[in-house]
UniProtKB/Swiss-Prot annotation:
This is TYMS opposite strand protein. Residues 57-111 are annotated as: Disordered. It comes from the Eukaryota. It comes from Homo sapiens (Human). Residues 91-101 have a biased composition (Basic residues).
């Protein structure tokens, strides 16, 4: 397929009968932008931005950009001093419900006057 035929085939859809007055005003502008912004790809074909002119209130197609480099990166955070590591049993996320000293399965009671469990005070 030659570049010219590719351009004509792609624009044929844009030259179709407009469905509304808005399309009638908008389609010629989109067709012109598509031709103006068609970019030549190394193998000689034309590549177009996808023109979705039939959808209501779409902006004009943007120029196709192939990004090879990444955008600006955030500066690396300065080195923080290492925090002392807690043993796994004392780590706040690992601490389960507090239990009684004897290993009784009753959860620690939250009564302000103290524990009423026969096995002793909670740990």
């Amino acid at each position: 397929m030659t570049p010219a035929s590719g351009a004509t085939a792609s624009l044929g859809r844009l030259r179709a009968r407009p469905r509304s007055r808005w399309d009638a005003a908008y389609l010629p502008a989109v067709a012109a932008v598509c031709v103006a912004r068609a970019s030549h790809v190394p193998n000689g074909t034309l590549r177009f931005g996808v023109c979705k002119a039939r959808r209501t209130m779409r902006p004009l197609p943007r120029r196709i950009e192939v990004r090879t480099k990444r955008g600006p990166q955030r500066p690396a955070a300065p080195e923080r001093s290492p925090q002392p590591r807690l043993p796994p049993s004392r780590h706040p996320s690992r601490r389960g419900p507090r239990r009684h000293l004897s290993g009784c399965s009753a959860p620690a009671c939250r009564i302000p006057t103290g524990c009423r469990c026969p096995c002793g005070r909670p740990s």
